């Protein structure tokens, strides 16, 4: 069990400083932070299971939260704890208020010194995004880390609820999670009998990449009545080339690009005039933050995707 109160392991911190992992200014900042927390430790009774299957417990609701990925930032705000966020990372652009919060680096490299000076009492880490060594260093400083990375619809709702538990904002967080579940269930019911549409969803351009059916985006394609042409591949995010897409000849090509208005990835396919998706003008843009971030806004992104597939059905 991990505890969030400022329950500190001083020996671990001193070891980090002495072996160089927390040297220099970071070491000084870390030691100052630790000394400020050397109060009698007690196990907390506010607990939640994270996505690494560890139970994280706090002695009191989190008041100073650091969210170390754009998705984590959105989820904390969705949980009703946006007013507690004291640190984010690059590209944490939603909600707009998050852009005013102090940045502590990016998803792949955290500025630990700056993070420590902000004195978070809870850090939200991204399972496959943040460097594990840095998250372990944060924990060794006595700062609890809650690992998240939703991989399905229920995982998104559950993440919001668990974060709300840790922040003491259950009323708002549970409401958001419930609305998300209900909205996704309504979409699933509406498109349950829809005629299948073959879909290529592009998540990257160089190298060309898609998703399989286990990926959250693949699940959304299926919910909308789409058939993912690469759904049965073993890799979650397979690398491809133009030739395999041409051979599969999807009825729809959907992509998000690198930004909300970047549609360049779709124009690339227009050179292949024999593609069914090109012949029928079924090249669709979906704002990436609405479907490529596992947050409650996925409901809006899925609705857009479903509407695009319905347009494709009407063009047969």
Language-model features: locations:
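His/Asp/Glu-enriched short active-site or ligand-binding loop at hydrolase and phosphoryl-transfer sites
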Residues: 89, 214-237, 257, 284-285
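N-terminal secretory signal peptides that target proteins for export/translocation
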Residues: 1-22
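Short helix-initiation/N-cap motifs at beta->coil->alpha
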Residues: 51-53, 104-113, 129, 233-242
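A short, structured surface patch at a secondary-structure boundary
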Residues: 63-118, 122-128, 229
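Cleavable N-terminal signal peptides
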Residues: 30-32, 42
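Extracytoplasmic substrate-binding proteins
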Residues: 45-48, 54-55, 121-122, 126, ...
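Short helices/loops that flank or line small-molecule/ion binding pockets
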Residues: 112-119, 141, 240-249
């Amino acid at each position: 069990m991990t505890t969030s109160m400022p329950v500190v392991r001083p020996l671990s911190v001193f070891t980090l400083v002495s072996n160089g992992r927390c040297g220099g200014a970071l070491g000084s900042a870390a030691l100052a932070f630790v000394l400020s927390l050397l109060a009698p430790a007690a196990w907390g009774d506010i607990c939640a299971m994270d996505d690494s299957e560890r139970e994280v417990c706090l002695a009191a609701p989190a008041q100073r939260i650091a969210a170390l990925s754009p998705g984590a930032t959105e989820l904390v705000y969705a949980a009703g704890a946006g007013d507690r966020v004291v640190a984010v990372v690059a590209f944490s652009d939603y909600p707009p208020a998050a852009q005013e919060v102090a940045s502590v680096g990016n998803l792949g490299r955290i500025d630990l010194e700056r993070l420590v000076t902000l004195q978070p009492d809870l850090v939200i880490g991204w399972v496959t995004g943040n460097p594990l060594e840095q998250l372990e260093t944060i924990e060794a400083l006595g700062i609890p880390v809650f690992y998240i990375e939703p991989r399905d619809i229920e995982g998104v709702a559950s993440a919001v609820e668990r974060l709300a538990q840790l922040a003491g904002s259950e009323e708002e967080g549970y409401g958001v999670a419930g609305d998300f579940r209900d909205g996704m269930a309504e979409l699933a019911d509406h498109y349950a009998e829809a005629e299948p549409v073959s879909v290529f969803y592009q998540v990257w351009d160089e190298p060309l990449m898609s998703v399989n059916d286990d990926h959250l985006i693949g699940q959304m394609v299926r919910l909308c009545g789409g058939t993912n042409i690469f759904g049965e591949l073993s890799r979650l995010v397979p690398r491809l080339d133009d030739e395999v897409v041409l051979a599969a000849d999807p009825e729809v090509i959907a992509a998000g690009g690198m930004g909300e208005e970047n549609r360049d990835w779709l124009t690339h396919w227009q050179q292949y005039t024999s593609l069914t998706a090109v012949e029928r003008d079924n090249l669709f843009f979906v704002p990436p933050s609405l479907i490529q971030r596992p947050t409650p806004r996925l409901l809006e992104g899925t609705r857009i995707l479903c509407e695009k597939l319905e347009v494709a059905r009407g063009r047969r």
